[in-house]
Amino acid sequence: MNKIILEDLKESNVPLYIPQILPHQLATLDFLNERSLKEKKSVLLFHKMGSGKTIISLLFSIIASIETKILIILPNTSIMDIWISKLYDSLLLLNKNDKYNLNNIEFTTRSRLNEELLGTNKNINDIITENIKKYDNYIIIIDEAHNFFGNASGELLIHIKQNSTARYVLLTGSPISNTIESLKDIVELLTNETFEYNKYIESAGNKVFQQRINKQGIELLKNKLTGLISYYDEDRKDIPSPIFQGNIKLLNYPVVLCPMSKLQEDNYNMISNQTENDMFIKLMMNVSLVALGDKENYTNFDLLMASNKQIFPNFYVSNGKFIGQELIDLNISSKLKYFMNSILTSPNAGKRFIYFANSTIGSTIIRSVMIANGISEYDKEIVNNFVCVNCLKERNCNNKECIPMKFVIITSKESNKGNNSYINKILSVFNEDVNENGSVIMFLFGSRIIAEAYTLKDIKEIWFLTVPETKSELEQCIARAIRSFAYKDKNTRVVVRICLATTPNALSNEISQIIEKYKDESLSDEEKTLLLNKFEMKLVNYAIDLPYDLRKQLYSEFKSEKAKVAYNIFINLSILTNNILNDNILKCFIIEKIRRYSYENSRYKLKDILSYIKKNLKFDYKNKIEDYVNEFVNDGVVVYNKSFGTCYIDWFKDDIVVKQIILEFNNYLLSYNY
């Protein structure tokens, strides 16, 4: 990052609701311009989730489009549509009259890229060379890059790098999201170095969390990645701080332990005894959410829903639906019982986002439970025994009309079916000001697709009914809701609950004691490392006795603690520069200074804005700054003024003034006065 830009723009803050390039974003643009565009190197943007990697990438793509072609790879088509729409919003932050070539910016998805290059081939070496060579001199930007590490997609990217002159910009808030194996992909995607796994990684066992980078590996990272990483993780003072609630704190977070009923515990133990190596098996995730009887009911769920049968007393399948008193008593699900008890005793609590990962079984049981308890599905018929947003089950709002609670479920199935417009429509309704308190849609149940790119507004509670695969995925979900523009009041109380289905005395005394010791803030790094090693041994020894949810959360947090070694290396490899600004970045900097000055001032002298722009610059740019200011005024750069709103700048005699942009409508034409 460029230190001059970073420190200068921090001095002249403007409200975050106005269009602008934030200080760290413009400072990162300089980094990308120097390393990727000028030096033709691959780089990693390790920026905290919610810090604006999207806008940085789009601005850089627009600037780079003058010189080269850019390919942006997104997780799915729905997210790709969002990026494409934001491309034109980003253009308004620059000078619209510059000779950008937006035709040089291409978008694709991970699956499309795989299909295009691999087709039906399973062997990466069989890819036709011409298919790779077309990416010569491309800058390839990869969103959520950590999802490419350690799989076939990552191998494909490495193959492209080895057989073309393409360079990468990797975007991630969590480079090592699952295992230390990610380091191999990071090194090979950023450099021409081959990462010899057995040489640089040592293992204390066959569990993923038992692997660690050795001293040789640390030296390799320092030697090869210095200057190729941009790190940003500044605490935001303009957003609410999430409040984690729970009845016990593990290594990182408080969690809610939800003891299973005897019915659910017996069902859990039966399935667990029939399942080998059940740590990351989807089956146990489903069993931890809801008791459905025999193992075949989980593995052949479609057949179960097509039948008419009793699963437990007071719990049946009939005509493709779950029915019975158990949907209300909820002995079948300790997590749903805790969740329902909370929402049915909390009037006017606002909007909730509820994360769950088991889309088929999860969607079906959640829908059945919500409807049985009086909460209607959005855009469907209102249930007879509805629960009111304001008075809950009383349905007596002081002679006012009651508002039925409603929910909606969004999973990757909608995206896979191509229903991106449906997802965008639902989220648009959910985020509207009229739904600020949840009167239109109160509950949004979402899977991982929400965590990847969508933004949620005015969320008051975030629930996790299934344990995310990694700590970074958990943080992504939270970051999608807690953003600078998502709340009118930064002091809004936002509660986060991670729910774990547990059995009695789930945590052994030894593991509990280590966790308590680890929380001691006075511990040295060496003492923490020793405790982590001890914790690792206990996890291995007691793993089989721990309930699935608790085990998975402990593994996730433990892996996160182990990954801090590599993270700290990455952080230290990120450097601040004081370089002279390249013309592309100097233009962006000048426009941003004009934008900030024009927020407070609607009329000013040329000499005043020049003085304001130059005051912290350490290099002499001769006449460039004045020439660019004149150019931008003549071109009518768009700004935002606190009195007049959206404006453009223009000359009035010898002064620079802001002129309001006014939309004018008649029966034939929507135009604007510019």
From Swiss-Prot:
Binding locations of ATP: 45-52
Transmembrane segments: none
Motif residue range(s): DEXH box: 135-138
First-level EC class: hydrolase
The enzyme's E.C. designation: 3.6.4.-
Keyword annotations of the record: Activator, ATP-binding, DNA-binding, Helicase, Hydrolase, Nucleotide-binding, Transcription, Transcription regulation, Virion
Keyword Metal-binding: no
Localization in the cell: Virion
Gene3D superfamilies tied to this protein: P-loop containing nucleotide triphosphate hydrolases
GO molecular function, one term: hydrolase activity
Disulfide bonds: none
Family that this chain belongs to: Belongs to the helicase family. VETF subfamily.
Protein name: Early transcription factor 70 kDa subunit
Species the sequence originates in: Melanoplus sanguinipes entomopoxvirus (MsEPV)
Primary gene name: VETFS
